[in-house]
Protein backbone atom coordinates (compact mmCIF):
# COMPACT_ATOMS: atom_id res chain seq x y z
CA UNK A 1 0.00 0.00 0.00
CA UNK A 2 2.86 2.34 0.85
CA UNK A 3 4.44 1.55 -2.52
CA UNK A 4 1.26 2.61 -4.33
CA UNK A 5 1.02 5.80 -2.26
CA UNK A 6 4.62 6.75 -3.10
CA UNK A 7 3.99 5.99 -6.76
CA UNK A 8 0.87 8.20 -6.84
CA UNK A 9 2.81 11.03 -5.18
CA UNK A 10 5.42 10.93 -7.96
CA UNK A 11 2.75 11.32 -10.68
CA UNK A 12 1.92 14.84 -11.87
CA UNK A 13 -1.76 14.73 -10.90
CA UNK A 14 -2.21 18.45 -11.62
CA UNK A 15 -1.16 17.87 -15.23
CA UNK A 16 -3.52 14.88 -15.38
CA UNK A 17 -6.39 17.11 -14.22
CA UNK A 18 -5.46 19.71 -16.87
CA UNK A 19 -5.35 17.00 -19.55
CA UNK A 20 -8.80 15.79 -18.45
CA UNK A 21 -10.24 19.29 -18.86
CA UNK A 22 -8.51 19.63 -22.22
CA UNK A 23 -9.86 16.25 -23.38
CA UNK A 24 -13.35 17.08 -22.15
CA UNK A 25 -13.74 19.92 -24.68
CA UNK A 26 -13.67 17.76 -27.86
CA UNK A 27 -15.87 15.19 -26.09
CA UNK A 28 -18.49 17.85 -25.37
CA UNK A 29 -18.63 19.18 -28.93
CA UNK A 30 -18.73 15.65 -30.38
CA UNK A 31 -21.62 14.86 -28.02
CA UNK A 32 -23.36 18.06 -29.13
CA UNK A 33 -23.14 16.93 -32.75
CA UNK A 34 -24.67 13.55 -31.82
CA UNK A 35 -27.46 15.36 -29.94
CA UNK A 36 -28.27 17.58 -32.92
CA UNK A 37 -28.29 14.57 -35.27
CA UNK A 38 -30.80 12.96 -32.91
CA UNK A 39 -33.20 15.83 -33.66
CA UNK A 40 -33.30 14.86 -37.34
CA UNK A 41 -36.03 12.44 -38.52
CA UNK A 42 -34.99 8.80 -38.96
CA UNK A 43 -31.65 7.11 -38.27
CA UNK A 44 -30.08 7.73 -41.69
CA UNK A 45 -28.04 10.71 -40.40
CA UNK A 46 -26.21 8.43 -37.93
CA UNK A 47 -25.45 5.95 -40.71
CA UNK A 48 -24.05 8.72 -42.94
CA UNK A 49 -21.95 10.16 -40.11
CA UNK A 50 -20.80 6.63 -39.32
CA UNK A 51 -19.19 6.29 -42.76
CA UNK A 52 -16.66 8.94 -41.80
CA UNK A 53 -15.26 6.63 -39.09
CA UNK A 54 -13.44 4.42 -41.60
CA UNK A 55 -12.36 7.45 -43.68
CA UNK A 56 -10.83 8.93 -40.53
CA UNK A 57 -8.80 5.73 -40.11
CA UNK A 58 -7.06 6.54 -43.41
CA UNK A 59 -6.25 10.03 -42.14
CA UNK A 60 -5.16 8.56 -38.79
CA UNK A 61 -2.50 6.45 -40.52
CA UNK A 62 -0.97 9.57 -42.07
CA UNK A 63 -1.47 11.58 -38.88
CA UNK A 64 0.41 9.06 -36.73
CA UNK A 65 3.25 9.11 -39.25
CA UNK A 66 3.36 12.93 -39.20
CA UNK A 67 2.07 14.31 -35.88
CA UNK A 68 3.67 11.81 -33.45
CA UNK A 69 7.30 12.50 -34.49
CA UNK A 70 6.66 16.25 -34.50
CA UNK A 71 7.10 16.62 -30.74
CA UNK A 72 10.68 15.38 -31.00
CA UNK A 73 11.67 17.39 -34.08
CA UNK A 74 10.02 20.65 -33.03
CA UNK A 75 11.35 20.33 -29.48
CA UNK A 76 14.90 19.59 -30.65
CA UNK A 77 14.98 22.83 -32.69
CA UNK A 78 13.60 25.19 -30.04
CA UNK A 79 17.04 26.53 -29.02
CA UNK A 80 17.68 27.72 -32.57
CA UNK A 81 14.98 30.18 -33.66
CA UNK A 82 15.96 30.08 -37.35
CA UNK A 83 15.95 26.27 -37.35
CA UNK A 84 12.60 26.18 -35.55
CA UNK A 85 11.09 28.72 -37.99
CA UNK A 86 12.31 26.66 -40.93
CA UNK A 87 10.83 23.45 -39.52
CA UNK A 88 7.57 25.23 -38.76
CA UNK A 89 7.21 26.64 -42.29
CA UNK A 90 8.36 23.52 -44.14
CA UNK A 91 6.39 21.28 -41.78
CA UNK A 92 3.20 23.19 -42.53
CA UNK A 93 3.90 22.86 -46.26
CA UNK A 94 4.70 19.14 -46.10
CA UNK A 95 1.85 18.09 -43.78
CA UNK A 96 -0.67 20.33 -45.54
CA UNK A 97 0.52 19.07 -48.94
CA UNK A 98 0.29 15.40 -47.95
CA UNK A 99 -3.21 15.87 -46.52
CA UNK A 100 -4.30 17.86 -49.58
CA UNK A 101 -3.17 15.08 -51.94
CA UNK A 102 -4.85 12.45 -49.74
CA UNK A 103 -8.06 14.50 -49.59
CA UNK A 104 -8.13 14.97 -53.37
CA UNK A 105 -7.77 11.20 -53.77
CA UNK A 106 -10.62 10.54 -51.33
CA UNK A 107 -12.83 13.20 -52.97
CA UNK A 108 -12.28 11.65 -56.42
CA UNK A 109 -12.88 8.05 -55.32
CA UNK A 110 -15.44 8.50 -52.54
CA UNK A 111 -18.28 6.57 -54.16
CA UNK A 112 -16.17 3.53 -55.24
CA UNK A 113 -14.72 3.44 -51.71
CA UNK A 114 -18.21 3.52 -50.18
CA UNK A 115 -19.29 0.64 -52.41
CA UNK A 116 -16.17 -1.34 -51.45
CA UNK A 117 -16.95 -0.70 -47.76
CA UNK A 118 -20.46 -2.15 -48.34
CA UNK A 119 -22.34 1.05 -47.47
CA UNK A 120 -26.09 0.88 -48.04
CA UNK A 121 -26.97 2.01 -51.61
CA UNK A 122 -29.64 4.28 -50.07
CA UNK A 123 -27.04 6.51 -48.39
CA UNK A 124 -24.09 6.38 -50.82
CA UNK A 125 -24.87 9.70 -52.53
CA UNK A 126 -25.44 11.60 -49.26
CA UNK A 127 -22.45 9.92 -47.58
CA UNK A 128 -20.19 10.85 -50.50
CA UNK A 129 -21.16 14.52 -50.19
CA UNK A 130 -20.51 14.52 -46.44
CA UNK A 131 -17.15 12.72 -46.76
CA UNK A 132 -15.98 15.22 -49.41
CA UNK A 133 -16.82 18.15 -47.13
CA UNK A 134 -14.98 16.51 -44.22
CA UNK A 135 -11.97 15.82 -46.46
CA UNK A 136 -11.54 19.57 -46.89
CA UNK A 137 -11.95 20.05 -43.13
CA UNK A 138 -9.19 17.50 -42.47
CA UNK A 139 -6.64 19.57 -44.41
CA UNK A 140 -7.36 22.54 -42.15
CA UNK A 141 -7.36 20.13 -39.20
CA UNK A 142 -3.81 18.87 -39.74
CA UNK A 143 -2.53 22.45 -40.08
CA UNK A 144 -4.28 23.25 -36.79
CA UNK A 145 -2.68 20.25 -35.05
CA UNK A 146 0.76 21.18 -36.43
CA UNK A 147 0.37 24.74 -35.18
CA UNK A 148 -0.71 23.49 -31.74
CA UNK A 149 2.42 21.31 -31.53
CA UNK A 150 4.49 24.42 -32.33
CA UNK A 151 2.80 26.32 -29.48
CA UNK A 152 3.64 23.51 -27.05
CA UNK A 153 7.24 23.43 -28.30
CA UNK A 154 7.78 27.16 -27.59
CA UNK A 155 6.34 26.79 -24.09
CA UNK A 156 2.90 28.30 -24.74
CA UNK A 157 1.04 25.40 -23.11
CA UNK A 158 -1.59 27.65 -21.53
CA UNK A 159 -2.50 29.02 -24.96
CA UNK A 160 -3.21 25.45 -26.09
CA UNK A 161 -5.84 25.19 -23.34
CA UNK A 162 -7.27 28.55 -24.42
CA UNK A 163 -7.54 27.45 -28.06
CA UNK A 164 -9.09 24.12 -27.03
CA UNK A 165 -11.78 26.03 -25.11
CA UNK A 166 -12.20 28.39 -28.08
CA UNK A 167 -12.73 25.42 -30.38
CA UNK A 168 -15.51 24.19 -28.11
CA UNK A 169 -17.14 27.63 -28.10
CA UNK A 170 -16.85 28.03 -31.89
CA UNK A 171 -18.25 24.52 -32.48
CA UNK A 172 -21.25 25.18 -30.25
CA UNK A 173 -22.01 28.39 -32.16
CA UNK A 174 -21.51 26.98 -35.68
CA UNK A 175 -23.34 23.72 -34.92
CA UNK A 176 -26.26 25.67 -33.49
CA UNK A 177 -26.53 27.77 -36.65
CA UNK A 178 -25.87 24.93 -39.12
CA UNK A 179 -27.29 21.71 -37.63
CA UNK A 180 -29.73 22.33 -34.78
CA UNK A 181 -33.52 22.28 -35.07
CA UNK A 182 -33.81 25.85 -33.77
CA UNK A 183 -35.84 28.31 -35.93
CA UNK A 184 -32.79 30.34 -37.04
CA UNK A 185 -30.71 27.28 -38.00
CA UNK A 186 -29.83 26.60 -41.65
CA UNK A 187 -30.76 22.92 -41.01
CA UNK A 188 -27.92 21.52 -43.13
CA UNK A 189 -28.18 18.14 -41.42
CA UNK A 190 -25.12 15.92 -41.27
CA UNK A 191 -23.32 18.09 -43.87
CA UNK A 192 -23.44 20.92 -41.34
CA UNK A 193 -20.92 18.98 -39.21
CA UNK A 194 -18.43 19.11 -42.08
CA UNK A 195 -18.99 22.80 -42.77
CA UNK A 196 -18.67 23.53 -39.05
CA UNK A 197 -15.31 21.72 -38.93
CA UNK A 198 -14.02 23.65 -41.96
CA UNK A 199 -14.98 27.01 -40.44
CA UNK A 200 -13.64 26.30 -36.94
CA UNK A 201 -10.38 24.61 -38.03
CA UNK A 202 -9.60 27.39 -40.51
CA UNK A 203 -10.30 30.25 -38.09
CA UNK A 204 -8.25 28.70 -35.27
CA UNK A 205 -5.34 27.86 -37.59
CA UNK A 206 -5.18 31.47 -38.82
CA UNK A 207 -5.29 32.82 -35.24
CA UNK A 208 -2.52 30.46 -34.02
CA UNK A 209 -0.31 31.26 -37.02
CA UNK A 210 -0.78 34.95 -36.22
CA UNK A 211 0.36 34.25 -32.64
CA UNK A 212 3.41 32.35 -33.91
CA UNK A 213 4.17 35.18 -36.32
CA UNK A 214 3.94 37.69 -33.47
CA UNK A 215 6.45 35.55 -31.55
CA UNK A 216 8.82 35.91 -34.52
CA UNK A 217 8.59 32.38 -35.93
CA UNK A 218 6.76 33.03 -39.20
CA UNK A 219 8.34 36.32 -40.24
CA UNK A 220 9.60 36.69 -43.78
CA UNK A 221 13.36 36.50 -44.17
CA UNK A 222 15.90 35.82 -46.90
CA UNK A 223 16.76 32.41 -45.50
CA UNK A 224 15.98 29.68 -48.04
CA UNK A 225 13.58 26.99 -46.85
CA UNK A 226 15.30 23.67 -46.17
CA UNK A 227 13.45 20.35 -46.31
CA UNK A 228 16.54 18.27 -45.43
CA UNK A 229 15.24 17.48 -41.93
CA UNK A 230 12.24 15.71 -43.46
CA UNK A 231 14.43 12.70 -44.32
CA UNK A 232 14.89 11.85 -40.64
CA UNK A 233 11.31 12.89 -39.95
CA UNK A 234 9.90 10.35 -42.41
CA UNK A 235 12.37 7.70 -41.20
CA UNK A 236 11.02 7.91 -37.63
CA UNK A 237 7.43 8.50 -38.69
CA UNK A 238 7.44 5.47 -40.99
CA UNK A 239 7.51 3.04 -38.04
CA UNK A 240 4.50 4.57 -36.27
CA UNK A 241 2.81 5.01 -39.66
CA UNK A 242 3.36 1.35 -40.57
CA UNK A 243 2.01 0.22 -37.18
CA UNK A 244 -1.05 2.43 -37.66
CA UNK A 245 -1.52 1.11 -41.22
CA UNK A 246 -1.55 -2.54 -40.12
CA UNK A 247 -3.91 -1.81 -37.20
CA UNK A 248 -6.34 0.46 -39.04
CA UNK A 249 -6.58 -1.50 -42.29
CA UNK A 250 -7.51 -4.60 -40.29
CA UNK A 251 -10.14 -2.61 -38.38
CA UNK A 252 -11.55 -1.12 -41.60
CA UNK A 253 -11.97 -4.50 -43.28
CA UNK A 254 -12.99 -6.64 -40.31
CA UNK A 255 -15.07 -4.18 -38.26
CA UNK A 256 -16.13 -1.05 -40.21
CA UNK A 257 -16.95 -2.94 -43.41
CA UNK A 258 -18.68 -5.79 -41.57
CA UNK A 259 -20.81 -3.31 -39.60
CA UNK A 260 -21.94 -1.85 -42.94
CA UNK A 261 -22.69 -5.35 -44.24
CA UNK A 262 -25.13 -5.97 -41.36
CA UNK A 263 -26.56 -2.43 -41.54
CA UNK A 264 -25.42 -1.34 -38.08
CA UNK A 265 -23.13 1.59 -38.89
CA UNK A 266 -25.36 4.18 -37.19
CA UNK A 267 -25.70 2.57 -33.76
CA UNK A 268 -22.07 1.39 -33.83
CA UNK A 269 -20.93 4.98 -34.52
CA UNK A 270 -22.95 6.33 -31.58
CA UNK A 271 -21.66 3.52 -29.32
CA UNK A 272 -18.08 4.40 -30.28
CA UNK A 273 -18.73 8.06 -29.50
CA UNK A 274 -20.03 7.12 -26.06
CA UNK A 275 -17.16 4.72 -25.29
CA UNK A 276 -14.26 6.73 -26.74
CA UNK A 277 -15.67 10.12 -25.82
CA UNK A 278 -16.84 9.52 -22.26
CA UNK A 279 -15.80 6.13 -20.86
CA UNK A 280 -12.25 6.23 -22.20
CA UNK A 281 -11.69 9.97 -21.68
CA UNK A 282 -9.70 9.55 -18.41
CA UNK A 283 -7.90 6.49 -19.79
CA UNK A 284 -6.73 8.29 -22.92
CA UNK A 285 -5.70 11.40 -21.01
CA UNK A 286 -3.78 9.23 -18.54
CA UNK A 287 -2.04 7.83 -21.62
CA UNK A 288 -1.02 11.35 -22.64
CA UNK A 289 0.38 11.89 -19.13
CA UNK A 290 2.31 8.60 -19.27
CA UNK A 291 3.82 9.57 -22.64
CA UNK A 292 4.98 12.92 -21.30
CA UNK A 293 6.36 11.59 -18.01
CA UNK A 294 8.29 8.55 -19.28
CA UNK A 295 9.66 10.40 -22.32
CA UNK A 296 11.61 12.80 -20.09
CA UNK A 297 12.79 10.28 -17.48
CA UNK A 298 13.22 6.52 -17.97
CA UNK A 299 13.03 5.96 -14.21
CA UNK A 300 9.41 7.16 -14.27
CA UNK A 301 8.53 3.74 -15.72
CA UNK A 302 9.74 2.16 -12.47
CA UNK A 303 8.46 4.77 -10.00
CA UNK A 304 5.09 5.69 -11.54
CA UNK A 305 3.71 2.46 -13.01
CA UNK A 306 2.03 1.29 -9.78
CA UNK A 307 0.30 4.66 -9.66
CA UNK A 308 -0.81 4.36 -13.30
CA UNK A 309 -2.34 0.94 -12.53
CA UNK A 310 -4.07 2.33 -9.43
CA UNK A 311 -5.62 5.24 -11.37
CA UNK A 312 -6.73 2.86 -14.14
CA UNK A 313 -8.34 0.51 -11.60
CA UNK A 314 -10.22 3.44 -10.05
CA UNK A 315 -11.46 4.49 -13.53
CA UNK A 316 -12.73 0.95 -14.24
CA UNK A 317 -14.54 0.83 -10.87
CA UNK A 318 -16.13 4.18 -11.75
CA UNK A 319 -17.37 2.67 -15.03
CA UNK A 320 -19.09 -0.15 -13.12
CA UNK A 321 -20.62 2.13 -10.48
CA UNK A 322 -22.07 4.50 -13.11
CA UNK A 323 -23.70 1.79 -15.29
CA UNK A 324 -27.22 2.77 -14.05
CA UNK A 325 -26.62 6.25 -15.51
CA UNK A 326 -25.77 4.98 -19.01
CA UNK A 327 -29.32 4.69 -20.33
CA UNK A 328 -30.50 8.12 -19.11
CA UNK A 329 -27.32 9.64 -20.58
CA UNK A 330 -27.93 7.93 -23.93
CA UNK A 331 -31.55 9.08 -23.99
CA UNK A 332 -31.30 12.67 -22.78
CA UNK A 333 -27.72 13.74 -23.56
CA UNK A 334 -26.98 11.77 -26.73
CA UNK A 335 -30.65 12.08 -27.75
CA UNK A 336 -30.59 8.56 -29.24
CA UNK A 337 -33.97 6.95 -29.86
CA UNK A 338 -33.22 3.19 -29.58
CA UNK A 339 -31.55 3.32 -26.15
CA UNK A 340 -31.90 -0.42 -25.44
CA UNK A 341 -30.04 -1.38 -28.62
CA UNK A 342 -27.27 1.15 -27.94
CA UNK A 343 -26.90 0.07 -24.28
CA UNK A 344 -26.80 -3.60 -25.30
CA UNK A 345 -23.97 -2.94 -27.76
CA UNK A 346 -21.97 -0.91 -25.23
CA UNK A 347 -22.32 -3.64 -22.58
CA UNK A 348 -21.02 -6.30 -24.99
CA UNK A 349 -17.85 -4.24 -25.41
CA UNK A 350 -17.66 -3.12 -21.76
CA UNK A 351 -15.47 -5.89 -20.27
CA UNK A 352 -13.06 -5.86 -23.19
CA UNK A 353 -12.41 -2.13 -22.81
CA UNK A 354 -11.28 -2.82 -19.23
CA UNK A 355 -8.47 -4.86 -20.81
CA UNK A 356 -7.81 -1.96 -23.19
CA UNK A 357 -7.56 0.45 -20.24
CA UNK A 358 -4.66 -1.53 -18.76
CA UNK A 359 -3.07 -2.10 -22.18
CA UNK A 360 -3.02 1.68 -22.55
CA UNK A 361 -0.33 1.82 -19.83
CA UNK A 362 1.90 -0.56 -21.78
CA UNK A 363 1.41 1.10 -25.16
CA UNK A 364 1.86 4.67 -23.96
CA UNK A 365 5.08 3.62 -22.22
CA UNK A 366 6.31 2.30 -25.58
CA UNK A 367 5.35 5.57 -27.30
CA UNK A 368 6.93 7.69 -24.58
CA UNK A 369 10.20 5.75 -24.69
CA UNK A 370 10.25 5.79 -28.50
CA UNK A 371 9.83 2.00 -28.74
CA UNK A 372 7.27 2.07 -31.55
CA UNK A 373 8.75 -1.19 -32.88
CA UNK A 374 6.95 -2.93 -29.99
CA UNK A 375 3.68 -1.42 -31.19
CA UNK A 376 4.38 -2.67 -34.69
CA UNK A 377 5.02 -6.16 -33.28
CA UNK A 378 1.65 -6.06 -31.50
CA UNK A 379 -0.22 -4.98 -34.64
CA UNK A 380 1.38 -7.59 -36.86
CA UNK A 381 0.73 -10.44 -34.39
CA UNK A 382 -2.87 -9.46 -33.56
CA UNK A 383 -3.98 -8.59 -37.07
CA UNK A 384 -2.29 -11.49 -38.85
CA UNK A 385 -3.17 -14.25 -36.38
CA UNK A 386 -6.46 -13.15 -34.82
CA UNK A 387 -8.17 -11.03 -37.49
CA UNK A 388 -6.53 -13.08 -40.24
CA UNK A 389 -8.17 -16.16 -38.75
CA UNK A 390 -11.58 -14.46 -38.64
CA UNK A 391 -11.19 -13.30 -42.23
CA UNK A 392 -10.56 -16.89 -43.36
CA UNK A 393 -13.54 -18.07 -41.27
CA UNK A 394 -15.74 -15.41 -42.93
CA UNK A 395 -14.60 -16.27 -46.45
CA UNK A 396 -15.14 -20.01 -45.90
CA UNK A 397 -18.57 -19.49 -44.35
CA UNK A 398 -17.55 -20.70 -40.88
CA UNK A 399 -18.40 -17.30 -39.39
CA UNK A 400 -21.50 -15.34 -40.39
CA UNK A 401 -21.36 -11.73 -39.13
CA UNK A 402 -24.07 -10.07 -37.06
CA UNK A 403 -23.84 -6.81 -35.11
CA UNK A 404 -23.41 -8.67 -31.79
CA UNK A 405 -20.99 -11.10 -33.42
CA UNK A 406 -18.86 -8.27 -34.83
CA UNK A 407 -18.80 -6.56 -31.42
CA UNK A 408 -17.71 -9.81 -29.75
CA UNK A 409 -15.08 -10.41 -32.42
CA UNK A 410 -13.66 -6.92 -31.89
CA UNK A 411 -13.89 -7.26 -28.10
CA UNK A 412 -12.02 -10.56 -27.97
CA UNK A 413 -9.53 -9.07 -30.45
CA UNK A 414 -8.97 -6.19 -28.02
CA UNK A 415 -8.32 -8.72 -25.24
CA UNK A 416 -5.96 -10.69 -27.51
CA UNK A 417 -4.07 -7.48 -28.33
CA UNK A 418 -3.85 -6.58 -24.63
CA UNK A 419 -2.25 -9.97 -23.88
CA UNK A 420 0.28 -9.52 -26.69
CA UNK A 421 0.99 -6.00 -25.43
CA UNK A 422 1.49 -7.32 -21.89
CA UNK A 423 4.01 -9.90 -23.14
CA UNK A 424 5.87 -7.20 -25.10
CA UNK A 425 5.83 -4.92 -22.03
CA UNK A 426 7.29 -7.67 -19.82
CA UNK A 427 10.05 -8.21 -22.38
CA UNK A 428 10.72 -4.45 -22.45
CA UNK A 429 11.02 -4.31 -18.66
CA UNK A 430 13.42 -7.25 -18.56
CA UNK A 431 15.56 -5.79 -21.33
CA UNK A 432 15.70 -2.13 -20.36
CA UNK A 433 14.48 -1.66 -16.79
CA UNK A 434 15.79 -4.59 -14.71
CA UNK A 435 19.45 -4.21 -13.68
CA UNK A 436 21.85 -6.89 -14.92
CA UNK A 437 22.60 -7.99 -11.33
CA UNK A 438 18.90 -8.74 -10.74
CA UNK A 439 18.67 -10.63 -14.06
CA UNK A 440 21.59 -12.90 -13.12
CA UNK A 441 20.04 -13.62 -9.68
CA UNK A 442 16.66 -14.48 -11.21
CA UNK A 443 18.27 -16.81 -13.72
Please tell me what each predicted stretch does.
Residues 40-43, 153-154, 187, 262, ...:
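Helix-loop interface residues and adjacent transmembrane-helix termini in multi-pass membrane transporters
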Residues 108, 121-147, 275-278, 337-362, ...:
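Alpha-helical transmembrane segments of multi-pass membrane proteins
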Residues 1-17, 188-197, 206-248, 429-443:
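Interhelical loop/hinge segments that connect adjacent transmembrane helices in multipass membrane
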Residues 47-104, 144-153, 268-324, 359-367, ...:
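Small-residue-rich hydrophobic transmembrane alpha-helices
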Residues 101-129, 317-344:
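Short membrane-interface helical motifs at transmembrane helix boundaries
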Residues 17-72, 137-141, 238-292, 315-319, ...:
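Transmembrane helix-bundle signature of multi-pass secondary active exporters and lipid flippases
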Residues 82, 150-177, 191-194, 198, ...:
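Alpha-helical transmembrane segments of multi-pass membrane transporters/permeases
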Residues 169-205, 340, 384-422, 427-433:
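Membrane-interface helix-loop junctions in multi-pass transport and translocation proteins
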Amino acid sequence: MNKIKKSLQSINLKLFAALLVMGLCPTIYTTLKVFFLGQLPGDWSYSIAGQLSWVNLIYEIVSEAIILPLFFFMGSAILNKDDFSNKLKTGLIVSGGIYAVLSIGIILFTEPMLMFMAASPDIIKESATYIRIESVANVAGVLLNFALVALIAIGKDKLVYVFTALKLAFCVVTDTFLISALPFSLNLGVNGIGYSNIIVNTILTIIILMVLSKEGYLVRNKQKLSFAWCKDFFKIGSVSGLESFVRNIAYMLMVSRMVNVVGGSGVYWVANNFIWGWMLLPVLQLGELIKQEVSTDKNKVKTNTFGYFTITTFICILWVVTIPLYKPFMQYVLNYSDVDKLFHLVMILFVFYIAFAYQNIFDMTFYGRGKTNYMLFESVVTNSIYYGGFFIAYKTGLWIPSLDGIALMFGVGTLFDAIVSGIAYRYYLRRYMIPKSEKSLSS
